[in-house]
């Protein structure tokens, strides 16, 4: 019996902007469904910005019938405070699909780039062209 198509949401966590994209994976074929950005109000308190990410992504997962989530792994920044804040945002981003019952997997940016472009150190223009 052939595998059924799977609807996957990809998430690129950030406190200011969290990018998301939904695809359908059907064997070796991928089909774009939707994409967007969640931008919490920058003037809101930190905890409210995290809540905004969590709630918005929960709605997006439900609206698009997602079954699995792929989250980009975090890299360590030069600024420890920024890295810690990104870690908080990443936690909210990972919890939203988990609460919705999705399987959540983590992938390194280089692995994602290699899968899309064929090279692990591709730039954003190369990725956009391939998508």
Each language-model region and where it sits:
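Phosphate- and other anionic-substrate recognition elements at nucleic-acid/protein interfaces
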Residues: 1-131
């Amino acid at each position: 019996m052939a595998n059924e198509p799977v609807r996957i949401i990809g998430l690129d966590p950030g406190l200011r902007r969290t990018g998301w994209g939904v695809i359908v994976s059907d064997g070796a074929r991928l089909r774009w469904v939707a994409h967007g950005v969640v931008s919490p109000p920058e003037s809101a308190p930190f905890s409210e910005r995290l809540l905004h990410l969590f709630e918005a992504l929960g709605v997006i997962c439900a609206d698009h019938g997602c079954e699995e989530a792929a989250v980009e792994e975090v890299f360590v920044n030069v600024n420890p405070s920024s890295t810690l804040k990104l870690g908080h945002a990443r936690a909210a981003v990972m919890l939203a699909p988990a609460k919705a019952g999705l399987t959540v997997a983590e992938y390194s940016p280089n692995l994602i780039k290699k899968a899309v472009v064929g090279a692990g150190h591709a730039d954003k223009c190369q990725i956009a062209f391939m998508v």
